[in-house]
């Protein structure tokens, strides 16, 4: 069963020892990180988005993940921190003019240069192939190399001119230390947003519960600041409106009571300048009065009987 014909077996062929740890090819790892989607493992195609930890995704893959969060997907752990589409930023990438794409090696008789990248830094011109550190801004989504950020120190984006802070700078495909720092920043940012939302809710409730002071609560009379001509016209209109009301109230009061108003003197018809025929209609006229001889003493009468 072997070992014949002068063959000498070696020790490693007969004795099984511990397996050596397989070393990952760095070039292959860089190609996978910078050219393929972290979630779907497909080639990156526009629109390309990045999360708060600096990982690259296809936007349609992120939308599908958010719509169907099934536990069976093993790759869902890579995007478990993405709760909504607001947690990712669409990147503004600059194309590499030297990139030929799939047209460069259609026959398969040429060597594929893995160091050639699809995108470059718009400021310095470095290729985004993983050999150089790249970052993007959360506020605008512009992508440029870290060297450009260090060489040209400014508080404004180098490409679009938008203002940014140090917290907005996120390293793409960084090391474990970079990911830890970005994770702590992400947690602090989300906690801060929750606290702000909680403080806004009671303020909104108070504004709804409190009534409008101008409508219900009585306050001082408002002084109209306008021209004197307009003020005089308003006062005249008010007087004319109040005059008929006062006359109507006087008529109604006099009609109900049947008495002259207070302070008015009683007017006798005998003193008036009317004719004698008109005066004779009333009991106060001399023709309506009788002497004591003409009237019986035992009959009580009034002047209305005559």
From Swiss-Prot:
Localization annotation: Chromosome
GO cellular component: nucleus; replication fork
Post-translational modification: Undergoes proteasomal degradation, via DDI1 and DDI2. Removal from stalled replisomes and degradation are required for genome stability.
Start and end residues of each stretch annotated as Disordered: 193-306
Single Gene Ontology MF annotation: DNA binding
PTM annotation (Phosphoserine): residues: 287
Biased composition annotated in UniProt, kind: Basic and acidic residues: 226-240
Keywords for the protein's UniProt record, in alphabetical order: Chromosome, Phosphoprotein
Family of the protein in this entry: Belongs to the rtf2 family.
Complex formation: Interacts with DDI2; probably also interacts with DDI1.
Protein name, per record: Replication termination factor 2
Organism: Pongo abelii (Sumatran orangutan)
């Amino acid at each position: 069963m072997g070992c014949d014909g002068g063959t000498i077996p070696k020790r490693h062929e007969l004795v099984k020892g511990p397996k050596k740890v397989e070393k990952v090819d760095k070039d292959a790892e860089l190609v996978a990180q910078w050219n393929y989607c972290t979630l779907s493992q497909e080639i990156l195609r526009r629109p390309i988005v990045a999360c708060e930890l600096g990982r690259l995704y296809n936007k349609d893959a992120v939308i599908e993940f958010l719509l169907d969060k099934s536990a069976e997907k093993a790759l869902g752990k890579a995007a478990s921190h993405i709760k909504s589409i607001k947690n990712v930023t669409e990147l503004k990438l600059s194309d590499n003019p030297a990139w030929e794409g799939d047209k460069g090696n259609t026959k398969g008789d040429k060597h594929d240069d893995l160091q050639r990248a699809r995108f470059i830094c718009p400021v310095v011109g470095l290729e985004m192939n993983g050999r150089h550190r790249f970052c993007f801004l959360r506020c605008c989504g512009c992508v440029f190399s870290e060297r450009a950020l260090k060489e040209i120190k400014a508080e404004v984006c180098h490409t679009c001119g938008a203002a940014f802070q140090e917290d907005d700078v996120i390293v793409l495909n960084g090391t474990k230390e970079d990911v830890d720092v970005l994770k702590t920043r992400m947690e602090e940012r989300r906690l801060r947003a929750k606290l702000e939302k909680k403080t806004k809710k009671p303020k909104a409730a108070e504004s709804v519960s409190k009534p409008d002071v101008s409508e219900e609560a009585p306050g001082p009379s408002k002084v109209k600041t306008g021209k004197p001509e307009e003020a005089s016209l308003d006062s005249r209109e008010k007087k004319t409106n109040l005059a008929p009301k006062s006359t109507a109230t006087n008529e109604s009061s006099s009609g109900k009571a049947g008495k002259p108003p207070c302070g008015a003197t009683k007017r006798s018809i005998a003193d008036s300048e009317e004719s004698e025929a008109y005066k004779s209609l009333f009991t106060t006229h001399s023709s309506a009065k009788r002497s004591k001889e003409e009237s019986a003493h035992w009959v009580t009468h009034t002047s209305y009987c005559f």
